[in-house]
Amino acid sequence: MQGEIIAGFLAPHPPHLVYGENPPQNEPRSQGGWEVLRWAYERARERLDAMKPDVLLVHSPHWITSVGHHFLGVPELSGKSVDPIFPNVFRYDFSLNVDVELAEACAEEGRKAGLVTKMMRNPKFRVDYGTITTLHLIRPQWDIPVVGISANNSPYYLNTKEGMSEMDVLGKATREAIRKTGRKAVLLASNTLSHWHFHEEPTIPEDMSKEYPATMAGYQWDIRMIELMRQGKTSEVFKLLPQFIDEAFAEVKSGAFTWMHAAMQYPELAAELFGYGTVIGTGNAVMEWDLRKAGLSMLGAADQKQRSAAVA
């Protein structure tokens, strides 16, 4: 078997997008809203459907672990996921299957690379809303096994450079695990871009007349970074990433974006933008890096050349 990273998606997780869609799993009902971003995810779903992956790997900033990088390690998980900040829009009944073999391989490769890793074995674990939201938005059928990865808090309690270095190692370990297990995988970076946001909610949450960028600076940073990604200027994106994080309060600080690109070996590959929009003022872009189309997806036995990124 030859492993393959088919594609990577920037797949943000505003629960409002699920709320606006009114799926049967989500208890609150809406009048719609955030259509541009939901349409963007419709395009991403079509792309994913054509890829036929074995597994979806998602790194979420809302499964926060202070000690080490944790992986879902229970074959089946179900329950109700509730957004603690927006329980009025997201109370979601989930049921998912976990690729435990691949998760264990990721943990082992991370451990061998010097990271602290741990398998989450609690059968009653309530999966965080970031993981659930991203997975629903990209694959509402819930018919593809997943690997859920926590966001180790090192970028915050150490510093951005040290934290991103850990995420770089984690991404490379993930790549090696996919190679050794022969999986055909899609990576999901569950991150918004600029994360400045409003502090008061409209009476009707889906009132789109109240939805716009929280700050001009955050919006301008988002557009600058999106343009670089669309042009395939990955090295420049990562050179600017620390400044972007500081000035736009960007959620990519939590590590998913770096993890994904490290696993993909930081390709200088133009990303496709499916859509950009705001949710409570934060900047959200749904984007795809199609490695299979570019001839960069296969992970052969000789795949040992790991390009160092700007985080090195």
Swiss-Prot record:
Positions of transmembrane segments: none
Outcome when changing E251A: Loss of enzyme activity
InterPro entries for the chain: 2A5CPDO_B (IPR034943), Xdiol_dOase_suB (IPR004183)
Pathway of action: Xenobiotic degradation; nitrobenzene degradation; Xenobiotic degradation; 4-chloronitrobenzene degradation
Record key words, sorted: Aromatic hydrocarbons catabolism, Dioxygenase, Iron, Metal-binding, Oxidoreductase, Plasmid
Transmembrane helix in keyword set: no
Pfam (any one): LigB
One of the GO biological process terms: catabolic process
Activity regulation text: Complete loss of activity in the presence of Ni(2+), Co(2+), Cd(2+), Zn(2+) and hydrogen peroxide, however activity with hydrogen peroxide partially restored upon addition of excess ascorbate. Partially inhibited by Fe(2+), Mg(2+), Ca(2+), Mn(2+), Cu(2+) and also by EDTA, at 2 mM concentration. Total activity inhibited in the presence of catechol or 4-nitrocatechol but completely restored after removal of catechol and addition of 2 mM Fe(2+) and 5 mM ascorbate.
Cofactors required: Fe(2+)
Swiss-Prot/TrEMBL catalytic activity: 2-aminophenol + O2 = 2-aminomuconate 6-semialdehyde; 2-amino-5-chlorophenol + O2 = 2-amino-5-chloromuconate 6-semialdehyde
Cofactor binding, note field: Binds 2 Fe(2+) ions per APD complex. The iron ions are bound to the beta subunit.
SUPFAM superfamilies from the UniProt entry: LigB-like
Function: Component of the 2-aminophenol 1,6-dioxygenase (APD) complex that catalyzes the ring fission of 2-aminophenol to produce 2-aminomuconic semialdehyde. CnbCb seems to be the catalytic subunit of the complex. Also active on other substrates such as 2-amino-5-chlorophenol (68% activity), protocatechuate (33% activity) and catechol (5% activity).
Quaternary structure and interacting proteins, as annotated: The APD complex is a heterotetramer of 2 alpha (CnbCa) and 2 beta (CnbCb) subunits.
Additional free-text comment from the UniProt record: Not active on 4-methylcatechol, 4-chlorocatechol, 2,4-dihydroxybenzoate, o-nitrophenol, p-nitrophenol or 4-nitrocatechol.
Protein name: 2-aminophenol 1,6-dioxygenase subunit beta
